[in-house]
Amino acid sequence: MDEWADEDGNVAPISYAPSLGGAFLKEFYMRFRPDLRPPLEQMHYYTNENIENYSDLIEEAGDGCADLVISATGWIGHTAFVDPGTEAFKADSLEEFLTLGTRFVDNRRLTIIQNSMAPTFGASGDLAYTPAYSVSVGPRDIFNARDHLERHDLGYFGNSSYSSWERMISRLQIYGPVTKDVPASIFQRCKGTVFVSEDMARPIEKMDFVAL
């Protein structure tokens, strides 16, 4: 759904260690038995050459749209790197927002902070090491997909940073108004399944301090 980029819009190659496309190939494609792997040319990822027409490639490969979007929500309410309030996904209305396809994104600072806690960047809040730019599918690609699977389960980033922030943004996505200010809220208008863990669903309440 997305990939890192630099400030000039150059897409990170799959040889870049934290590459999302590289992780897709390693953790998905290469886990198939060699005799069961689909042809490599059927595995699509971002490059400098295809970013301008990636939405068209999705529609061409999927006979009109993607069959399935598998996703989770970011702290800022994004899906993929469709961050709210960015120039890339600026729109005057929700209807216009839903027509926007793949593009280069100057990520919001909260997204960068969240990503800095991922194991690929050391799970340590190292903002200097964490990319500030990306390329991403757009609302058009997500909204038009035939089916959707969302996961809300309070995971961990590496060995630290329990993602308790998910509780609030998940509630906004699932139960709040459908708005471009919470891009992931568009899933409310889509066919699909949202998995919500018991830990995620429990009430938001004050936590007791533990004496050390």
Model regions: which residues?
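Active-site histidine-anchored catalytic micro-motif
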Residues: 1-14, 65-68, 79-107, 132-133, ...
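Ligand-binding beta-strand-loop-alpha-helix segment within the catalytic cores
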Residues: 1-70, 129, 196
